[in-house]
Amino acid sequence: MLSTFAVRWRTTKTTKPQNEDALDHSGAHGVEPSGSTVVFTDITEAPLEPLYAAAKAEVMTDAMGALVIFDGIVRNHDHGSAVRGLSYSAHPQAREYIAEVAAEVAAELDGVRLWAVHRVGPIAIGESALTVMAAAAHRGRAFDACELVADRVKARVPIWKEQELLDGSIEWVGVDTSPA
C-alpha cells in the first residue's frame, strides 16, 4: 500500500543588509566564519572525560554547524596481544609539538576551531588517551580538521606508550628499541 506524504516547501531569499560594514563577520550574524582558531591544546595527567562539556562549549560558536570528536580510547588488545593496562610518557616539549600541530591544521583549513589534549601517565582500559574536537560551519571541514590533528599528533608529538600485556610482559610502542 502506498502512502501519500504532504511536503511543505519553504522558500528562502538571500538578502543583503543595508549596511554591510555593520556586520560582525565572526559568524554571529549569519556569516560563515573566516580564519581558524586553536582554542586549546595540552598534555595532561588528568582524566580527559571531565573536560568534554567545557571543551565543547569553548569550541562551538553560533556559526558552527558541525562538531567532530575523535576520542582515542585505551583498548584491551593490541596487534593480537591482550593488554592489561598502559602508561604514556611524553618528551618535555610535547606541549609545544601538539600546539604546533593544531596551529598547522588551523592555518591549512579556514573556518575551524580546534581543541586537542593527550593524556600521559597510567590510563585504564576504557579511558580516553587522546581527544580532538574540531568545529566548523560544515561537517566535511570539521571531519577533515579532526582527522588531520589526530593523525599528526600520533605521528609527530613525542609521546610513547608502555603497554603491560596480560602475559606479564612489557611492550613499548613508538620507541625504537633496536640495537644501535
Give each language-model segment a name.
Residues 2, 7-129, 135-147, 151-180:
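N-terminal, polar/charged subdomain of small-to-medium soluble alpha/beta proteins
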